[in-house]
Amino acid sequence: MNKLKKYLTKENITITIVLLVGTIISSVFMFKQVYNGIDTAYHMSRIIGITNSWKAGDLLAYIHLNTSGYGYAMGFFYSNLFMILPSILYMLGMNIILVYKIFILMCSIATVITMYICTKQISKSKYAATISAFLYTTCSYRIITLVVKAFVGEILSFIFIPLIILGLYQLIFEDTKKWWIFTIGFVGILNSNLVMTEIMIYISAVFVLCNIKKIIKDKGRLKGFIKATVLALLVSAMFWMPMIEQLIKSTFHMKDGMNMYRPTWWLLSFGDLFNGLMKLGTQITPAYGLGFIFIVIAILRLAIKNEDAQKLKFCDISILAGLVLLLCMTKFFPWKYLKTLGGMIQFPSRLEVPAAAFFSIASGMICHYLTEKKTILRRIIFGIIIIYQIGFVFMCIKSCEDALIEVELYRGLDSVYIDENFEYDICDGMYLPEGANVQSKLISHGRHEEKKDKYKTNNSECNFKYAKNGLKVNISFENNKEVNTYIEVPIYYYYGYVAENPENNTKYKIEKGDEGVIRVYLENSESGTIQIYYKTTIVQKLSIIITIVTLLGIIICVKKSA
């Protein structure tokens, strides 16, 4: 009770209310219906695919059981970790739209918390942390990502980027014993989105290179980076090891898919960098700036003098980092000479996520130092920011809705909203096996597979029957008098599928056939039974062991230190 009274101060209650308002305002767009953004159906399909895989007995769900029944290897390249809870809710019978709403709301809560923690530890100011968290959670790019783009990988990345920045700050400038923050940040972002992970690796590398002398001189800082990196890899082994195995053993449509993306198509004019509102047109994937409020607060930095040099130094670094990232979204950055890098990050707008984080941290710190010991001014600035940002969020949502209405006919949609009967969406189909001939149609710039069961053989004399359950197929065949007879089944081939006789464990050769599906050779068998299923590989088993052992080790170490 005493602890509760200690917490329930006027200041803490105000902070809680403001952050709660920020969380609700950033999620207000889905109080009624959810907009059918670019990837809304795609990520809802992930939830459905994982649930279907679980129901079929596949707990790892590396290959999602989709509506076509062919299977789609989403789980190898898009971690299932943060989709576990939504998938459980959906499996328990909750409406998929409601599940998605709960997921987005949880992301908003987590986002406001991580940015508050980040700025609080850097600035040692609750005031700065509150402003940073509020601006970050309600920044226009995040609203556009939530409403129009529905890029869940970026939405999740908003949560973990503040932790990566805080980890960098602790390891380079302050307490090296807090290296584990860097680990948490990278484990989170690796399980959120591979492209955002790549971007944060580049940003972290720049920070390290700019401070390399300091890091090399202080062995504690160097050891901290090594420990943080190794631990992040060990904890995340269950995701990245199976992914790398697939990339080595199989070929995917992503090689062609990468050619679909050119950063030069999505660049902004310099004047739009801080616009923060959607523009009408058929292209709804470019960046649209962070919001004018960030540049206003950044200019106020010039009015601060003779304060904590170290804290102001990081504030200035944050402003510089944010500006550089924004400039990368303009024609001033030489994307035409960096086609490989551009193809990997797909859209320069992704750089707005870390840019928003840096500007939010700097904004909170500037407001803190500018109004320190000036209570009335502090309250006025605080109030102006809250009122302005709330109004701007509603303007941003309205611009998003207008843009979706404008593009509705272009996308062939019946409504700007999505309903629970949406069609299963695999987006650009980048994780299909190479050669897959998808019977598809354009849905939110993505591919939808039509349900079909197509079995075929190169031996018309061979008779066979089949029974399919999920991503498992049982085949009974007879009258095979040819040596090279094969049967193709309607399941996409990914490394790990096996074919064997369930009675005597005889193995049958299996490979990728026409249109990327599984082809099994009957070889010299005149008749028999074949069971085709996905078998957990040695690498996958090893990765699970590494992750579990590492997590157990962390628990033991934490208990001992406590």
Predicted feature residues:
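Intrinsically disordered, low-complexity segments enriched in small/polar residues
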Residues: 35, 60, 69-70, 76, 259, 410, 427, ...
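Solvent-exposed, flexible loop/coil residues
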Residues: 67, 150-151, 156-160, 345, ...
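Membrane-embedded transmembrane-helix bundle of lipid-linked glycan/lipid transferases
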Residues: 1-402, 531-533, 539-562
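Intrinsically disordered, low-complexity regions enriched in small/polar residues
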Residues: 64, 72-74, 80, 102, ...
